């Protein structure tokens, strides 16, 4: 009986450790296929990102940091140059011009530092 309780505890711990942890990002469920143009990018920090155009000036961004995957929705906002999308919390920004984008996202310690990090991403 003790072994079974230990195995259950270990299983719960592994399940919880697999949860997404990036602070300041809304984690959305992955939805089924929908219409829209999908564009893929590789970022200088090692991230891979996919941007999908949605309705009403909204894009979904899916990105992977090599460990965890995230999905969020960003709204189009006016920009002097290129196309800019921002989430409601202003913690994710995707500023795209031609085949290059600047991706701004929360630092891993965002809850403590409030710092955002930026990387350049290239369409492939």
From Swiss-Prot:
Cross-referenced InterPro entries: MliC, MliC_sf
Q: Which residues form the signal peptide?
A: 1-18
Q: How does it sit in the membrane?
A: Lipid-anchor
SUPFAM superfamilies hit by this protein:
YdhA-like (SSF141488)
Instruction: Indicate yes or no for the key word Lipoprotein.
Output: yes
Q: Which UniProt keywords apply?
A: Cell membrane, Lipoprotein, Membrane, Palmitate, Signal
Q: Which GO terms describe its cellular component?
A: plasma membrane
Locate the lipid attachment (N-palmitoyl cysteine).
19
Q: S-diacylglycerol cysteine lipidation sites on this chain? A: 19
Q: Which PROSITE patterns match?
A: PROKAR_LIPOPROTEIN (PS51257)
Name-wise, this protein is: Uncharacterized lipoprotein PM1176
Q: One Pfam family from the UniProt entry?
A: MliC
Q: Work out whether the entry's keyword set contains Lipoprotein.
A: yes
* Localization: Cell membrane
């Amino acid at each position: 009986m003790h072994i079974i309780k230990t195995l259950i505890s270990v299983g719960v711990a592994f399940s919880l450790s697999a949860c997404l942890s990036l602070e300041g990002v809304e984690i959305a469920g992955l939805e089924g296929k929908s219409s829209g143009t999908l564009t893929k990018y590789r970022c200088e920090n090692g991230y891979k990102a996919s941007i999908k155009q949605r309705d009403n000036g909204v894009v979904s961004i899916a990105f992977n940091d090599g460990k965890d995957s995230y999905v969020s929705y960003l709204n189009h906002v006016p920009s002097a140059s290129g196309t800019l999308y921002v989430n409601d919390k202003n913690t994710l920004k995707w500023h795209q011009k031609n085949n290059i984008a600047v991706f701004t996202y929360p630092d891993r310690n965002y809850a403590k530092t409030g710092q955002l990090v930026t990387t350049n991403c290239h369409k492939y």
